[in-house]
A protein has these predicted regions:
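Helix-rich cap/lid subdomain of alpha/beta-hydrolase
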Residues: 115-158
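Conserved serine/cysteine hydrolase catalytic core
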Residues: 141-211, 217
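C-terminal alpha-helix
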Residues: 73, 219-227
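Structural beta-sheet core signal
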Residues: 17, 86, 112, 173-175
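Conserved HGGG/HGGXW glycine-rich cap/lid loop of the alpha/beta-hydrolase fold
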Residues: 1-53
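Conserved hydrolase catalytic core segment
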Residues: 82-121
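Short beta-to-alpha linker loops that shape the active-site pocket of alpha/beta-hydrolase fold enzymes
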Residues: 45-49, 116, 203-205
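Active-site loop/oxyanion-hole signature of alpha/beta-hydrolase fold enzymes
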Residues: 46-84, 191
Length: 236
């Protein structure tokens, strides 16, 4: 495995952020800035696209590629015996679900926002085919990170179905309030039911972290740091 790429900002308990799409953290500056008021925010760039890797050859990705890379990041930034909070959005939400399945001991609480595990839905294969076709049709001339996502991330990640039960209080599966009635809202509900995680609504839609960064960040903070335990220590 190559050295993982990540950026660190803020202070407080560690919050690992895994972006969606191809993992490029573009546009996440405002939400991470807000989160950095309460957390040491570690933003993982699984393909190194924001660290000079854009334009380099990319192999087809699997959730395990990203989750094991995220685990390597945690091994670098956490002291022995510590655990981290985790936030993943969209494809990053799938990666953090897989991270929780593989390495629960390093994780305090995981928030997976609209992970597109659409195969959990009735007619899951059909739902996945329509989702993939719709995204590709709408981004036929995509370049940069979106092109990488469509070519190497979209199909393998949407085939992922979580097959674990989360310990109580360790997983929140979120969907945007503006996504009600849409396939990814229903998917988030199904993921919560499958894993035993809590379900929560967050501000905005699928891109709530970009559309409403302050409100989204505050909802993350409320979820991870309940008001009766602000700045809870990171112990397992």
């Amino acid at each position: 495995m190559t050295e993982p790429h990540y950026d660190v900002t803020g202070s407080g308990p560690v919050l690992l952020v895994v972006p969606g799409g191809a993992g490029h953290p573009m546009g996440l500056g405002p939400v991470t800035e807000r989160l950095a008021e309460r957390f040491t925010v570690v933003t993982y760039d699984p393909l190194g696209l924001a660290h000079g890797g854009l334009g380099s050859p990319v192999a087809d990705q699997r959730p395990a590629n990203w989750s094991e890379g995220a685990h390597a990041v945690l091994e670098e930034v956490l002291a022995a015996g510590e655990s981290a909070y985790v936030l993943g959005t969209s494809s990053g939400g799938i990666a953090v679900l897989d991270l929780l399945a593989r390495h629960p001991g390093r994780l305090r609480h995981v928030v997976a926002h609209e992970p597109p595990c659409v195969t959990l839905l009735p007619d899951g294969a059909g739902q996945r085919a329509r989702l993939v076709a719709g995204l590709r049709a709408g981004q036929a001339s995509a370049e940069g990170p979106m092109a990488v996502f469509l070519a190497h991330v979209l199909e393998p990640f949407t085939a992922y179905a979580p097959a674990f039960t989360a310990s109580p209080g360790r997983l929140t599966v979120a969907a945007g309030a503006d996504s009600r009635g849409q396939v990814l809202y229903d998917t988030a509900v199904s993921v919560a039911e499958r894993t035993g995680g809590a379900f929560a609504e967050f501000p905005g839609g699928h891109l709530g972290a970009l559309e409403h960064p302050v409100a989204f960040a505050d909802r993350v903070t409320e979820t991870l740091l309940p008001v009766d335990t602000p700045g809870a220590p990171l112990t397992t």
